[in-house]
């Protein structure tokens, strides 16, 4: 087992918590972050709203039936990004090995940290305290020898808690871990596992690699390792990139049409980033991740720059239409990105 010390930090109901911080009179009420509209979906739900069964990616229409008294506030992605930058500034006091997963979660490798703190649990405790002191928001943390285990651990004491999974306790922990707790195991995969008599990671571990490959294809390699607590992926430090993108990991696997419901707010979020960076883009890429971790991408490249958010959304919807609607596929992530970036006004806009 690896001797690395990995922390997974996950902010608690991040978007909703930021909105509650800005509008404290809403505290204690079920709050939903979403644009209202017939085809809108929830971006985030407060813990009070979750008690009624509301969750991100649920349609607003369904949410209103389940919880008519919920308060709806539109998302403010620029604000979320500002708060996320504050949180990352806290991370950088301890390590430069930071791998952001989204605005509200990240992996940190603190095996060697700037403050020479020997215990990763103490590093996590300090980080969580600093985040709360500086933003008023709570975070949960998982501490483990690798990224896979740290991500599971961060969910164990939510909200506002942390859980340590040392190497010598990993196998016992996995023995009774429900399969649905394994990141990436969605409804489709879980149903197949259960049909094979599996309920826990311990059950999964009793299958040979060849059997898993037979039942799950290439994903069987990953399942074989995860059942044994093995994950050698390094924490990849953030690097400057030649494109701008945004994506969302869905809380449950969704068919293509429902996943497409996220495109409008993804496009709006991405357009804000483009505007803030003062650049223009000539290509649009759609990214989808299936329940078994296959990546599907589609790209459109234009001879001129995208003029506005509407054009960006239209391009993303055109790309979505190019994805074969295979009924057996369920999707756990959707994202869009832009490339072929140029400084604003450098290239004449030929869309007009």
Swiss-Prot record:
Positions bearing the site annotation: Substrate discrimination: 15
Gene3D superfamilies: 3.30.70.270, 3.40.1170.60, 5' to 3' exonuclease, C-terminal subdomain, DNA polymerase, Y-family, little finger domain
Keyword check for Nucleotide-binding: no
Active site: 105
GO cellular component terms given for this protein: cytosol
Binding site for Mg(2+): 10, 104
Cofactor note: Binds 2 magnesium ions per subunit.
Enzyme class: transferase
GO biological process, one term: error-prone translesion synthesis
Cellular localisation: Cytoplasm
Key words of the record: Cytoplasm, DNA damage, DNA repair, DNA replication, DNA-binding, DNA-directed DNA polymerase, Magnesium, Metal-binding, Mutator protein, Nucleotidyltransferase, Transferase
Family: Belongs to the DNA polymerase type-Y family.
Self-association state and partner proteins as the record states: Monomer.
Entry-linked NCBIfam families: PRK02406.1
Function per UniProt: Poorly processive, error-prone DNA polymerase involved in untargeted mutagenesis. Copies undamaged DNA at stalled replication forks, which arise in vivo from mismatched or misaligned primer ends. These misaligned primers can be extended by PolIV. Exhibits no 3'-5' exonuclease (proofreading) activity. May be involved in translesional synthesis, in conjunction with the beta clamp from PolIII.
Name recorded for this polypeptide: DNA polymerase IV
The species this protein was found in: Neisseria meningitidis serogroup A / serotype 4A (strain DSM 15465 / Z2491)
Gene designation per UniProt: dinB
């Amino acid at each position: 087992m690896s001797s690395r010390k990995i922390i997974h930090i996950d902010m608690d109901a991040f978007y909703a918590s930021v909105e509650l911080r800005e509008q404290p009179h809403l505290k204690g009420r079920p709050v939903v972050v979403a644009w209202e509209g017939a085809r809108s979906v929830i971006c985030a739900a407060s813990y009070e709203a979750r008690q009624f069964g509301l969750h991100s990616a649920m349609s607003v229409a369904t949410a209103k039936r389940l919880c008519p008294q919920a308060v709806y506030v539109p998302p403010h992605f620029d604000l979320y990004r500002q708060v996320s930058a504050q949180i990352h500034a806290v991370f950088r006091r301890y390590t430069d090995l930071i791998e952001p997963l989204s605005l509200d979660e990240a992996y940190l490798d603190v095996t060697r940290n700037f403050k020479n703190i020997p215990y990763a649990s103490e590093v996590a405790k300090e980080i969580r305290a600093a985040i709360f002191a500086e933003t008023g928001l709570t975070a949960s943390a998982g501490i483990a020898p690798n990224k896979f285990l740290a991500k599971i651990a961060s969910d164990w004491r939510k909200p506002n808690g942390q859980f340590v999974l040392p190497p010598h306790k990993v196998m016992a922990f996995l023995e009774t871990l429900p399969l649905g707790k394994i990141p990436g195991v969605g409804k489709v995969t879980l149903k197949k596992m259960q049909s094979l008599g599996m309920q826990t990671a311990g059950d999964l571990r009793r299958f040979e690699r060849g059997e898993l490959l037979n039942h799950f294809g290439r994903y069987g390699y990953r399942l074989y390792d995860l059942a044994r607590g093995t994950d050698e992926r390094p924490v990849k430090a953030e690097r400057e990139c030649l494109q701008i993108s945004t994506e969302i990991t869905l809380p449950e696997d969704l068919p293509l049409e429902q996943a497409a419901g996220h495109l409008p707010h993804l496009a709006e979020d991405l357009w804000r980033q483009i505007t803030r960076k003062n650049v223009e883009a000539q290509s649009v890429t759609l990214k989808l991740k299936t329940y078994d971790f296959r990546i599907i991408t589609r790209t459109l490249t234009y001879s001129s720059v995208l003029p506005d958010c509407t054009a960006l959304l239209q391009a993303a919807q055109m790309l979505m239409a190019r994805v074969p609607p295979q009924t057996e596929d369920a999707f756990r992530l959707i994202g869009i990105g832009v490339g072929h970036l140029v400084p604003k006004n450098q290239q004449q806009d030929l869309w007009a």
